[in-house]
Amino acid sequence: MTALAIRGGHLLDPAAGVDGPKDILFKDNRVAEIAAPGKLKLANGAETLDARGLVVAPGLVDIHVHLREPGQGYKETIATGTAAAAAGGFTSEIGRAHV
């Protein structure tokens, strides 16, 4: 079992009513626990990331995307455009027609 703790980040989750500093524990790529800063009990070997001063949020949705296919794949492909979005924290995109 792999464990990762993100410590002290400003967690923003409007659906859960959370807006403030938290520690988040992930086990096997799933959220296992959310606690006040410094309150997580970690097993030996757990990786930790210091997120103080950073925002931690669920995946973002880009509601206005123009992917360049078909017709302008030399500028950007669906694969490169969605990879760039994922690198920026976007887990969903709403594509617009590019005419």
Features from the language model and the residues they span:
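Non-transmembrane, interaction-prone segments in cytosolic or luminal domains
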Residues: 9, 16, 22, 26-27, ...
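Active-site metal-binding motif and surrounding structural segment of the metallo-beta-lactamase
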Residues: 39-56
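N-terminal metal-binding scaffold of metallo-dependent hydrolase/deaminase domains
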Residues: 1-43
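Conserved acidic residues
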Residues: 3, 46, 91
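Intrinsically disordered, low-complexity peptide-like regions
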Residues: 11, 48, 60-62
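Metal-associated gating/positioning segment near the N- to mid-region
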Residues: 52-96
